[in-house]
Amino acid sequence: MSKVTIPQGYHASLSVYELQRAIEFIKSNFQTNLSNALNLRRVSAPLFVEEASGLNDNLNGYERPVSFDIPDVHAEAQVVHSLAKWKRLALKRYQFNVGKGLFTDMNAIRRDEEVDNLHSVYVDQWDWEKVIAREDRTVDYLKRTVRDIVGAVCETNDALGVAFPSLHTKLERDVYFITTQELEDRYPDKTPKERENAIVREHHTVFLMQIGGKLKSGKPHDGRAPDYDDWQLNGDILMWNQILECAFEISSMGIRVDEASLDRQLTLAGCDDRRDLPFHKMLLHGELPLTMGGGIGQSRVCMLMIGTCHIGEVQSSIWDKATIDACRSAGILLL
């Protein structure tokens, strides 16, 4: 059965040709706005990493990476889930100074993703990472960076509306900040997803903070790997999707673990076996720079600004027959 939802009366605002122009416009303009706002430089990034390196992102802990052997180099490789750990190592290798960072065009395969209007097994992100000082590992610094990112999104959307007058997406620049515990306290009888919808429906642009650790209910709001974000200094940028009428995550980000928070979170997550991996050893010994970073979904941003109802309208992927048939019946072209 298809999990696709098609809003009543929905139709594409642009022809396929104009849609491709709009996607190019968004990607070109946003990466410029983002790099200027956060002082980032574009770098090349890997599609796969060695399994033994520990550099792949374990996401929520259950997703299986796409793996393959490379006989000529006697190694097992994994297609990346994200570049969260690779970026931090790259900042050290490339000798970035405090206040400067990098961004990449990240392409990933998440084979265990449950596909629907918003989710695909193909993931495309602007992955970014920045060197910070120890005194910048604060909630205030995190909030300032969130506001900078939201500003870059809104500036791009404003420019898109001028270039493509048939597009009318309105985005809220003012960010409402709330922790996952505060959100649970406000809506104790709702599921995490229902809580997100309720708060974003009210405030339109929300940064939901402190994701990964257990709440008073005994459950985390959502899963986070223990070895990249500091669970006290991270969060998701959520915007209201006018087409689907739901909370719409465009970015997961945070200040990264230092030696103490990595040590604590590995124990809490039952992942002490990772301490012997090369990346984790370097981090625990203080050999990597202190950083913050995140991923910003390219297809998600395009969906939001162009006003499409399915992510397959702005990216090429593979879909089940029920989804293809439902979209075809509604006149929706999946790329």
Model-predicted segments: where are they?
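Class II aminoacyl-tRNA synthetase-like tRNA-binding/catalytic domains
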Residues: 2-119, 127-131
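Generic recognition of stable, solvent-exposed alpha-helical segments in well-folded globular domains
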Residues: 18-25, 29, 137-144, 148, ...
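A generic secondary-structure signal for well-formed alpha-helical elements
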Residues: 34-41, 149-160, 309
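A glycine-rich phosphate-binding loop feature that marks nucleotide/adenosyl-phosphate handling sites
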Residues: 47-51, 165-172, 320-324
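A general structural signal for short secondary-structure junctions and capping/turn motifs
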Residues: 68-70, 92-98, 118-120, 168, ...
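Extracellular structured ligand-interaction cores
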Residues: 100-102, 123-127, 203-205, 245-247
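Extended, charged alpha-beta segments that form solvent-exposed binding/catalytic grooves
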Residues: 104-190, 194
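A translation/RNA-centric and nucleic-acid-associated enzymatic feature enriched
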Residues: 109, 180-335
